[in-house]
């Protein structure tokens, strides 16, 4: 009995200690990392309500090995966010999507953070590695070592400097929405009142005018989506033949689009008709794209430049489907300026002065998205009149001279007929690559820009070429240049291919990549256009 009483006393003591620990308030909350959480974190409403619905302007996050990180707390769309300084914390601890964070409130505005991996086991960190702080210092947010200090005054002054650095970083980020470290920008990177993860996502280097922001936010509030919306502003590369396409930010695609190349479904609000464009996932993990029936969607919905599309993922569906809301932009020539707004979707601020004057009128849906591309289109590829440049052209040519109007028209028609998911590689037959002649045979050189993205860089790979129902095995040779990178050539086996298909100087070969594991390409041949007159 005595032992039982002792056990009960210990249990009561533990309960009392736990209740005192709680202090009548909730102490902990758990968050699982998603793609949107890498740049800001939404705190649970129930947890915030236990603090009177208000969290101080800045809080301190203590990492598992005692280093403090100062993070700004903001309120957006009735949500409480950890924002400025949060990304530095994530980067310093290499926190990945699928991992979990357990926040425990210690005192005042200080929280202890336990980091769990995707298997729900605690992650172990090297104290020396994190205290070095190089990753964090690159982000201009200095860690504060609270594990031990010879002087309390030194620690306090260090924390003061930390807060000053945070304030400076936040102020500069609010003034400029450029150069977001995330690779693409959530809207609050440009306008802090719009939260990431709970509102919408813009592609990299995309800026909305005030009129666009207001219309987009209003429409999103009207439809109240439960999932983050992707916003795109239509440009020439999204609309014009031969192969219009829409670029999707890789981080957004990693959450809401298929993990590999696949067909998705698009539909309009309250409409029965559906479209099935092909979502192409690029090998290099940069921005991905919609092609194929995207052209049908553009045509059927009469999309024009400056129209805004909002892609709302369908919740809970097995297939990847999106409801697309449209905000139409109608060009006006009105001189009195009534209800005219400048809503340029320029990729940088110096282009904002050239923004078109347009009326915006609401369509039966709302849609926002804009893409930009860091990969410029050189003279090797199909030229675009869009100054922003497509992130990926319909085809890439290895020719140094520009195509004539007849050549360009013929190649574009062929590319459109092929309907490839990825760009076509276009090569022209030279004296050293044709089937005739006794000169030195060098083989056919492919576009290095195309090959660097879509072909292996290992030397002496076997490439299977298909043409008119027949198959040839070609040796793919990669030659390294000391100053200009690599060059790709089709050598052994190419002469037979050229002979069997009666290739002559000036003929065009369009290479369509069919398989990547067993490297296979379909070859479409266009005879020398100079033999035919330029007549319709």
Swiss-Prot record:
InterPro entries: B3_DNA-bd, DNA-bd_pseudobarrel_sf, REM16-like. It comes from the Eukaryota. Residues 344-355 have a biased composition (Polar residues). The keyword Secreted does not apply. Pfam families: B3. Keywords: DNA-binding, Nucleus, Repeat, Transcription, Transcription regulation. Gene3D superfamilies: DNA-binding pseudobarrel domain (2.40.330.10). Residues 145-160, 171-183 have a biased composition (Low complexity). It is found in: Nucleus. Residues 372-382 have a biased composition (Basic and acidic residues). CDD domains: B3_DNA. Residues 138-199, 335-396 are annotated as: Disordered. One of its GO terms (cellular component) is nucleus. Residues 26-119, 231-330, 429-529 bind DNA. This is B3 domain-containing protein Os03g0619800.
């Amino acid at each position: 009995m005595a032992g039982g009483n002792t056990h009960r006393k210990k249990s009561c003591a533990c309960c009392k200690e736990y209740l005192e620990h709680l202090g009548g308030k909730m102490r902990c909350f758990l968050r699982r990392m998603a793609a949107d959480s890498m740049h800001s974190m939404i705190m649970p409403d129930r947890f915030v309500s236990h603090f009177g619905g208000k969290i101080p302007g800045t809080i301190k996050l203590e990492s598992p090995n005692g280093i403090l990180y100062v993070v700004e707390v903001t309120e957006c769309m009735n949500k409480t966010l950890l924002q400025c300084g949060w990304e530095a914390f994530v980067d310093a601890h290499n926190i990945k999507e699928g991992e979990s964070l357990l926040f425990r409130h210690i005192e005042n505005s200080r929280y202890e953070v336990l980091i769990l991996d995707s298997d729900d086991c605690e992650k172990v960190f090297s104290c020396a590695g994190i205290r070095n702080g190089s990753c964090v210092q690159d982000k201009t947010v200095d860690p504060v070592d609270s594990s031990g200090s010879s002087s309390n005054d030194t620690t306090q002054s260090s924390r003061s400097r930390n807060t000053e650095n945070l304030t400076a970083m936040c102020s500069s980020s609010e003034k400029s929405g450029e150069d977001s470290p995330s690779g693409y920008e959530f809207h609050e990177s440009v306008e802090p009142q719009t939260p990431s993860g709970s509102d919408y996502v813009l592609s990299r280097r995309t800026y909305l005018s005030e009129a666009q922001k207001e219309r987009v936010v209003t429409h999103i509030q009207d439809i109240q989506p439960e999932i983050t919306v992707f916003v795109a502003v239509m440009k020439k590369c999204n609309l014009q033949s031969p192969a219009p396409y829409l670029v999707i930010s890789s981080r957004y695609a990693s959450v809401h689009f298929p993990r590999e190349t696949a067909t998705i479904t698009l539909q309009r609000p309250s409409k029965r008709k559906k479209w099935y464009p092909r979502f192409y996932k690029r090998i290099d993990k940069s921005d991905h794209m919609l092609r194929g029936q995207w052209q049908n969607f553009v045509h059927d919905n009469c999309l024009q430049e400056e129209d805004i599309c909002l892609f709302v993922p369908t919740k809970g569906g097995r297939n990847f489907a999106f409801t697309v809301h449209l905000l139409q932009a109608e060009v006006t020539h009105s001189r009195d300026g009534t209800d005219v707004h400048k809503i340029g979707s320029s990729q940088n601020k110096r282009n904002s002065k050239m923004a078109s004057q347009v009326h915006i009128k609401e369509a039966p849906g709302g849609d926002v998205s804009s893409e930009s591309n860091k990969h410029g289109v050189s003279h090797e590829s199909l030229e675009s009149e869009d100054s922003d440049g497509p992130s990926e052209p319909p085809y890439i040519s290895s020719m140094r001279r520009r195509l004539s109007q007849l050549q360009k028209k013929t190649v574009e028609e062929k590319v459109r007929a092929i309907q490839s998911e990825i760009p076509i590689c276009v090569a022209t037959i030279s004296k050293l690559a044709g089937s005739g002649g006794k000169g030195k045979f060098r083989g056919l050189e492919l576009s290095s820009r195309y090959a660097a993205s879509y072909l292996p860089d290992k030397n002496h790979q076997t490439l299977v070429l298909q043409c008119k129902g027949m198959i040839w095995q070609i040796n793919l040779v990669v030659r390294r240049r000391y100053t200009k990178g690599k060059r790709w050539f089709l050598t052994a086996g190419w002469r037979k291919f050229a002979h069997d298909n009666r290739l002559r100087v000036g003929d065009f070969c369009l290479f369509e990549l069919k398989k990547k594991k067993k490297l296979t390409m379909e070859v479409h041949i266009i005879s020398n256009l100079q033999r035919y007159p330029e007549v319709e």
